[in-house]
């Protein structure tokens, strides 16, 4: 598979020299607003959202290959990123449609791929809530939606990152029952969206297990859904269905738990191509910003935030370059 010139240029901008994506995510909107308001005890202004995102971007991007932001509150932050870091912009509205079943997605009303590119995006990111267990009527809508996005990114010659997050209505997605189902949700989602018809250049995926239920893991909470060997087999099985590069998302777990999942992927010999890691890096700083303000948060980021991102970066030594997947010659990488 070869990339078009614009897609190749965009992917190189968000990757390190090795062709690994070591990106930070700061496109959280509704969930971040709620978390800040809860800690602060009052409403959160637009200026606070912009300031929080700008501080994370300024302090963490010297240690990242890229930052993922949203065009609603993240554009001022995008101007404060380090020169080494590329920019991914989110195109979807925060959350999902709660008026009917299926967690259907929606795009930002005043944005298009063309406009995101004009705002400085090197790559476009879309989040989709998806489960292969939903009915055909729901998933057919989602498949058509992703096809349209793939075509819009192709028309603008910009890389398309698709993030899919599994779910099951009426079930605790952090609980044991979903942990048993999660591998199949992740594997079948990857099998679907790796198809060329969707035009996805990089899949942003969940790890296929819940580490809290892996027997013998440091994160193990006492109830077994899988042995360590079974968990490693599931990592390998998920990787085996991918024909496109894939990177892991942190899904709001702790830095220690996310780091351990990357170690397990490495031990399983999985050729993952990087991470897009958000809350595992900065979420513990939310109360610091809400209660003590910008300077205290900056100091927290400079110590704890940087430590967290370096912790993840250390685990990326085991990640594989996407160059070989897209037949990029070593001589072309610097071009």
Which stretches of residues belong to each language-model region?
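Alpha/beta catalytic barrel-like cores
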Residues: 1-136, 199, 223-227, 244-245, ...
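Active-site glycine- and acidic-residue-rich loops that bind
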Residues: 2, 134-143, 175-187, 250-260
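Conserved, mostly hydrophobic/aromatic
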Residues: 24, 163, 203, 278
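Flexible glycine/acidic-rich beta-alpha junction loops that bind and position SAM and/or redox cofactors
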Residues: 33, 170-175, 201-220, 280-292, ...
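Active-site-adjacent beta->alpha loops and helix N-cap segments on the catalytic face
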Residues: 73-78, 132-154, 161, 212-219, ...
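Structural recognition of alpha->loop->beta junctions
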Residues: 120, 176-205, 265-276
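Surface-exposed cleft-lining segments at the edges of enzyme active sites
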Residues: 124-140, 171-180, 218-223
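Glycine-rich anion-binding loop/nest that anchors nucleotide
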Residues: 202-207, 245-254, 274-276
